[in-house]
C-alpha cells in the first residue's frame, strides 16, 4: 500500500516537472546553436547594443547643444567684440583657365574655425561631435562668399560635402568642398610669352569688420595645394595667401582674404602651332626670288598661297583670344611675318614691271634692226612672256622704211660675208639680252640676301624683348 502511494506521487511530480525540464533543455540547445552557427552574429548584435550611443545618450543633440534655447540668427557675442573666424584652404585642383572668358575654375576644401559658447556641452571624455549638413541650417555659420565669382557650388555626391565638428568648449569647425569659377583680369600684351596673376577673394557678405574678423588660421601656412597639381598650358609658379580690407560706401569696411597664384604659360605649344608655321611661310615666300622672272604663274601662285596661309594663321589665333584693344606679342610676330610675305609679292611685281618697261625700250630701239635681219619682234616678245600679239600695235607703215633710207641702211649694215653677218647678229642679241638680264635680276639678287638678314634681325630683337 505504501509502495503504491509512493509510485503515484513520483509519477505526479514527474508530470509537473517535465515541461520545465524540456524548456531548460530547449534553452540549452538554443544556446548551443547560437554558440555554434550564429556565434559571430550574436557578438555583433551585442557589440552594437553596447556602442549605440544614440540610445545610450539620454537627450537629443538639439537639447545637448541648446539649439532650442538660443537664437542662432544672431552671431556669437552679439553687441560685443567681433567674432574671429579663421580660414584655411586646401586647393585640390585648378580645373581650367579660359583666356576668352578671362576666368578660372578651382576646386578646394574651405574650412572655417570659430567659437560659439552657445554650442558648448559637458563631456567627460572631452570628445567632439561630428555632424553633416543638416545641423548647419539650425546654428549660426559665417556667411563667406567669393568676390568676382561667376559660378560656384558645393559638391553633393553622394551627399552634400559639408562637415561640422563641435567641441565641448564651443569651438566649431565647418569644412566644405567647393568648386568656384571666378574672374581673372589678364593682360595679354605679352601673349603667349606672358605670366598671369590671378586671385580668389573671400569676404563676409553681411558682417563688416565691427561684427566679424576674418583671418588666415595658420598665417601663410593656411593655404595648401596638391603636390602634383599641373595644367596643360600653364606652369604654376607660386601660391600665396594674403589679406586686406574692402570698403563699401553704404556698409563700411570688410575683411577680405586673397588666394593668389601665378601662372606662366608653356610657350612650346605656341611655337609648334603658331610661330613655326609662320616662319615656314616666310621662308617659302623667299623661294620666289630663285624662280625665273618669266615664270609668271609660278611666282604669282606661290605669293598668293603664302599670303592666304598667313591670313589663316592670324585668324585662327585671333579666334581663340578675347577681342582686346591692344597688340599682343603674337600679333606683332604674325603681322611682321605677313609683311615679309606681302613684300615678296610686291618684289616680283616690281621686277615684272621694270622688266616690261626695259623690254619696251629695247623693242623701240631694235625694232627696225630686227626687221632688217628678218626677226619678228612680235614673236620675240611673246616668247619672252611679257607681251602678246594683241598688245602690240604693229603698224606696217611705221615699220616700213622708205627706199632711200632702206638703201642707205642696207649699204651701212649689210655684211660683206655670211660669217660677219652672223657675228654681228650675235653681238647685237647678246648686248640687248645682257641689258635685260642685268636690269631684271638686280632686285632678285639683293632680295635673296636682304630679306633673310632683316628677318633674322627681327627675330633676335623680338625674342630678346619678350623673353
Curated annotation (Swiss-Prot):
<keyword id="KW-0869">Chloride channel</keyword>
<feature type="glycosylation site" description="N-linked (GlcNAc...) asparagine">
    <location>
        <position position="220"/>
    </location>
</feature>
<keyword id="KW-1003">Cell membrane</keyword>
<keyword id="KW-0407">Ion channel</keyword>
<dbReference type="InterPro" id="IPR036719">
    <property type="entry name" value="Neuro-gated_channel_TM_sf"/>
</dbReference>
<dbReference type="GO" id="GO:0022851">
    <property type="term" value="F:GABA-gated chloride ion channel activity"/>
</dbReference>
<feature type="topological domain" description="Extracellular">
    <location>
        <begin position="25"/>
        <end position="266"/>
    </location>
</feature>
<feature type="disulfide bond">
    <location>
        <begin position="184"/>
        <end position="198"/>
    </location>
</feature>
<dbReference type="InterPro" id="IPR036734">
    <property type="entry name" value="Neur_chan_lig-bd_sf"/>
</dbReference>
<feature type="topological domain" description="Cytoplasmic">
    <location>
        <begin position="353"/>
        <end position="446"/>
    </location>
</feature>
<keyword id="KW-0628">Postsynaptic cell membrane</keyword>
<feature type="binding site" description="in chain A">
    <location>
        <position position="111"/>
    </location>
    <ligand>
        <name>4-aminobutanoate</name>
    </ligand>
</feature>
<feature type="binding site" description="in chain A">
    <location>
        <position position="175"/>
    </location>
    <ligand>
        <name>4-aminobutanoate</name>
    </ligand>
</feature>
<feature type="signal peptide">
    <location>
        <begin position="1"/>
        <end position="24"/>
    </location>
</feature>
<feature type="transmembrane region" description="Helical">
    <location>
        <begin position="300"/>
        <end position="320"/>
    </location>
</feature>
<keyword id="KW-0812">Transmembrane</keyword>
<feature type="transmembrane region" description="Helical">
    <location>
        <begin position="332"/>
        <end position="352"/>
    </location>
</feature>
<protein>
    <recommendedName>
        <fullName>Gamma-aminobutyric acid receptor subunit rho-3</fullName>
    </recommendedName>
</protein>
<feature type="topological domain" description="Extracellular">
    <location>
        <begin position="321"/>
        <end position="331"/>
    </location>
</feature>
<dbReference type="InterPro" id="IPR018000">
    <property type="entry name" value="Neurotransmitter_ion_chnl_CS"/>
</dbReference>
<feature type="topological domain" description="Cytoplasmic">
    <location>
        <begin position="288"/>
        <end position="299"/>
    </location>
</feature>
<dbReference type="GO" id="GO:0034707">
    <property type="term" value="C:chloride channel complex"/>
</dbReference>
<feature type="binding site" description="in chain B">
    <location>
        <position position="203"/>
    </location>
    <ligand>
        <name>4-aminobutanoate</name>
    </ligand>
</feature>
<keyword id="KW-1133">Transmembrane helix</keyword>
<dbReference type="GO" id="GO:0004890">
    <property type="term" value="F:GABA-A receptor activity"/>
</dbReference>
<dbReference type="InterPro" id="IPR006201">
    <property type="entry name" value="Neur_channel"/>
</dbReference>
<dbReference type="GO" id="GO:0045211">
    <property type="term" value="C:postsynaptic membrane"/>
</dbReference>
<keyword id="KW-1015">Disulfide bond</keyword>
<feature type="region of interest" description="Interaction with SQSTM1">
    <location>
        <begin position="347"/>
        <end position="448"/>
    </location>
</feature>
<feature type="transmembrane region" description="Helical">
    <location>
        <begin position="447"/>
        <end position="467"/>
    </location>
</feature>
<dbReference type="InterPro" id="IPR006029">
    <property type="entry name" value="Neurotrans-gated_channel_TM"/>
</dbReference>
<dbReference type="GO" id="GO:0007214">
    <property type="term" value="P:gamma-aminobutyric acid signaling pathway"/>
</dbReference>
<keyword id="KW-0813">Transport</keyword>
<dbReference type="Pfam" id="PF02931">
    <property type="entry name" value="Neur_chan_LBD"/>
</dbReference>
<comment type="subunit">
    <text>Three rho subunits (rho-1/GBRR1, rho-2/GBRR2 and rho-3/GBRR3) coassemble either to form functional homopentamers or heteropentamers. Forms a ternary complex with SQSTM1 and PRKCZ.</text>
</comment>
<dbReference type="InterPro" id="IPR038050">
    <property type="entry name" value="Neuro_actylchol_rec"/>
</dbReference>
<dbReference type="GO" id="GO:1902711">
    <property type="term" value="C:GABA-A receptor complex"/>
</dbReference>
<keyword id="KW-0406">Ion transport</keyword>
<dbReference type="InterPro" id="IPR006028">
    <property type="entry name" value="GABAA/Glycine_rcpt"/>
</dbReference>
<keyword id="KW-0770">Synapse</keyword>
<dbReference type="GO" id="GO:0007268">
    <property type="term" value="P:chemical synaptic transmission"/>
</dbReference>
<comment type="function">
    <text>Rho subunit of the pentameric ligand-gated chloride channels responsible for mediating the effects of gamma-aminobutyric acid (GABA), the major inhibitory neurotransmitter in the brain. Rho-containing GABA-gated chloride channels are a subclass of GABA(A) receptors (GABAARs) entirely composed of rho subunits, where GABA molecules bind at the rho intersubunit interfaces. When activated by GABA, rho-GABAARs selectively allow the flow of chloride anions across the cell membrane down their electrochemical gradient.</text>
</comment>
Amino acid at each position: 500500500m505504501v509502495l503504491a502511494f509512493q509510485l503515484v506521487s513520483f509519477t505526479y511530480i514527474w508530470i509537473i516537472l517535465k515541461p520545465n525540464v524540456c524548456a531548460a533543455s530547449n534553452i540549452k540547445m538554443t544556446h548551443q546553436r547560437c554558440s555554434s552557427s550564429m556565434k559571430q552574429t550574436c557578438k555583433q548584435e551585442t557589440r552594437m547594443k553596447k556602442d549605440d550611443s544614440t540610445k545610450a545618450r539620454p537627450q537629443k543633440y538639439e537639447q545637448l547643444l541648446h539649439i532650442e534655447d538660443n537664437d542662432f540668427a544672431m552671431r556669437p557675442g552679439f553687441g560685443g567684440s567681433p567674432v574671429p573666424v579663421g580660414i584655411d584652404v586646401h586647393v585640390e585642383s585648378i580645373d581650367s583657365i579660359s583666356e576668352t572668358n578671362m576666368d578660372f575654375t578651382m576646386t578646394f576644401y574651405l574650412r572655417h574655425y570659430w567659437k560659439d559658447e552657445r554650442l558648448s556641452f559637458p563631456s567627460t571624455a572631452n570628445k567632439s561631435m561630428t555632424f553633416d549638413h543638416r545641423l548647419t541650417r539650425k546654428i549660426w555659420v559665417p556667411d563667406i562668399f567669393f568676390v568676382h565669382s561667376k559660378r560656384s557650388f558645393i559638391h553633393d555626391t553622394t551627399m552634400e560635402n559639408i562637415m561640422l565638428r563641435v567641441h565641448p568648449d564651443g569651438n566649431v569647425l565647418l569644412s566644405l568642398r567647393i568648386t568656384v569659377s571666378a574672374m581673372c583680369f589678364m593682360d595679354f600684351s605679352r601673349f603667349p610669352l606672358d605670366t598671369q596673376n590671378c586671385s580668389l577673394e573671400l569676404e563676409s557678405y553681411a558682417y563688416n569688420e565691427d561684427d566679424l574678423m576674418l583671418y588666415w588660421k595658420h598665417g601663410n601656412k593656411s593655404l595648401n595645394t596638391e603636390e602634383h597639381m599641373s595644367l596643360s598650358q600653364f606652369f604654376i609658379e607660386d601660391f600665396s595667401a594674403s589679406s586686406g580690407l574692402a570698403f563699401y560706401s553704404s556698409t563700411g569696411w570688410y575683411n577680405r582674404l586673397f588666394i593668389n597664384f601665378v601662372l606662366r604659360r608653356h610657350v612650346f605649344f605656341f611655337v609648334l602651332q603658331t610661330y613655326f608655321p609662320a616662319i615656314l611661310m616666310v621662308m617659302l615666300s623667299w623661294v620666289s626670288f630663285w624662280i625665273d622672272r618669266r615664270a609668271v604663274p609660278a611666282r604669282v601662285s606661290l605669293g598668293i598661297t603664302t599670303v592666304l596661309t598667313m591670313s589663316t594663321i592670324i585668324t585662327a589665333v585671333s579666334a581663340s583670344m578675347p577681342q582686346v584693344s591692344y597688340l599682343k606679342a603674337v600679333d606683332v610676330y604674325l603681322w611682321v611675318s605677313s609683311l615679309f610675305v606681302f613684300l615678296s609679292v610686291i618684289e616680283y611685281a616690281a621686277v615684272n614691271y621694270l622688266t616690261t618697261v626695259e623690254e619696251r625700250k629695247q623693242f623701240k630701239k631694235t625694232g627696225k634692226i630686227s626687221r632688217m635681219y628678218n626677226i619678228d619682234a612680235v614673236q620675240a616678245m611673246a616668247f619672252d612672256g611679257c607681251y602678246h600679239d594683241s598688245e602690240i600695235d604693229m603698224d606696217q607703215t611705221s615699220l616700213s622704211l622708205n627706199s632711200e633710207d632702206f638703201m642707205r641702211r642696207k649699204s651701212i649694215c649689210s655684211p660683206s660675208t655670211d660669217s660677219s653677218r652672223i657675228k654681228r647678229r650675235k653681238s647685237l642679241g647678246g648686248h640687248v639680252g645682257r641689258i635685260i638680264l642685268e636690269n631684271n635680276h638686280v632686285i632678285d639678287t639683293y632680295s635673296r640676301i636682304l630679306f633673310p638678314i632683316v628677318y633674322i634681325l627681327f627675330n633676335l630683337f623680338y625674342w630678346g624683348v619678350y623673353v
